């Protein structure tokens, strides 16, 4: 994984830091990703000051970073985004969840200690995520 300027990064840099972390795995050519991006941005805005972080990971690879940048700009995403090769991101998903990434968007939700709480592929139930981070944040 790397940022859009090519600096290497790791998922572990964004998880286990005392905050909930929602990861959205996306592709600039994915129609469902385009529909989900504004919903995830709204989730990010709602929880920005409540111990919840959002991270995007594009599978457009470094060669497609211009498409990834355009996707972020067009969807007005204010949360950090990384880019990775599709195979590397799929392996990361498999290592993290024990299941294959069957498409995009993919979602991973980590608790404040960095443990995977829930995951899935396809449209996400943002209301469910709101409830999960809301309930547990009270106990933080």
What are these regions (language model features)?
Residues 1-21, 46:
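A short beta-strand-turn-helix
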Residues 75-77, 85-134:
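Thiol/disulfide oxidoreductase modules built on the thioredoxin-like
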Residues 22-23, 54, 107:
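Hydrophobic beta-strand anchors of alpha/beta hydrolase catalytic cores
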Residues 1-3, 25, 109:
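Hydrophobic beta-strand positions
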Residues 34-76, 86-94:
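Structural microenvironment flanking redox-active thiols in thiol-disulfide oxidoreductases
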Residues 1-2, 136-140:
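Non-globular targeting/processing and membrane-anchoring segments
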Residues 18-21, 26-29, 61, 103:
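Short pre-active-site segment immediately N-terminal to redox-active cysteine/selenocysteine motifs
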């Amino acid at each position: 994984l790397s940022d859009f300027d090519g600096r290497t990064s790791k998922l572990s840099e964004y998880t286990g830091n005392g905050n909930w972390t929602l990861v959205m795995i996306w592709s600039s050519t994915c129609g469902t990703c385009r529909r989900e991006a504004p919903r995830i941005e709204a989730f990010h805005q709602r929880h920005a000051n409540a111990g919840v972080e959002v991270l995007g990971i594009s599978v457009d690879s470094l060669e497609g970073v211009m498409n990834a940048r355009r996707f972020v700009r067009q969807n007005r995403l204010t949360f950090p985004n990384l880019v990775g090769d599709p195979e590397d991101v799929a392996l990361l998903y498999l290592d993290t969840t024990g299941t294959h990434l069957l498409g995009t968007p993919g979602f991973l939700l980590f608790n404040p200690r960095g443990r995977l709480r829930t995951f899935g592929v396809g449209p996400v139930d943002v209301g469910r995520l709101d409830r999960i981070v809301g309930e547990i944040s009270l106990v933080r």
